[in-house]
């Protein structure tokens, strides 16, 4: 099939690779424009742009697809289908209508649960035991289009980074399967029941509130690994918790109290025991390594964000 691929981050790269490996004709790759990054703020191409250039596929990164010129250029590609994976731009109706089979999206949840920008993180935060990938026909609504196929994946204590990588691989394989036999995957309208929305992650959500239950904080740590990173503050410094375990607590300590020399921290229900942490500007380390160079003794009271 003659395809335009539209994607930007690491999540999208496996789908691009899978389309090429399956023998499809990639007419163009659309991705977000290069962004300033690093200390020097040099313009850095996205993971999809880098991979497309390695593969020798023409790359386009319009700032918008709303203007008539961009839409005419897209229509002139004479596509069978456009495949979309975390592209990051709204597709107006002329773009959705241009390919013969429309635009198919790789979405990182089991729709209609977790429509929106952050389905992986929201599934972890909610304690969902399973999530997955949906191949859907795009329409103007936010992830509201009919579904062609789904595949489930257990969450199993994974971080957002680990789960995203797994969903990227399974979504790539599922998209290739769908394209190989479109008549065998008729679109099914999403049910009206069970709709939830995966709002974009606000950095303010990443500060740990020890007045939450230990299980919820453990999910917060996994949901925000690798970014933006769940953190607490001590002596004016942010300490990121990269991994922790939720443990029982039977003492009278207030939430936020460090209750032993292993950095076990009391929560409103239970306690958390960090296993991997990171100081600002430092490499990740074990909790023991942190404590050898940064005193947080038993009895220390760690602050939680003010409640509004």
From Swiss-Prot:
Keywords: Protein biosynthesis, Transferase. It is an enzyme of class 2 (transferase). Belongs to the Fmt family. GO terms for cellular component: cytosol. (6S)-5,6,7,8-tetrahydrofolate binds at residues 109-112. Gene3D superfamilies: 3.40.50.12230. The gene is fmt. It comes from Rhizorhabdus wittichii (strain DSM 6014 / CCUG 31198 / JCM 15750 / NBRC 105917 / EY 4224 / RW1) (Sphingomonas wittichii). It catalyses: L-methionyl-tRNA(fMet) + (6R)-10-formyltetrahydrofolate = N-formyl-L-methionyl-tRNA(fMet) + (6S)-5,6,7,8-tetrahydrofolate + H(+). This is Methionyl-tRNA formyltransferase. Its EC number is 2.1.2.9.
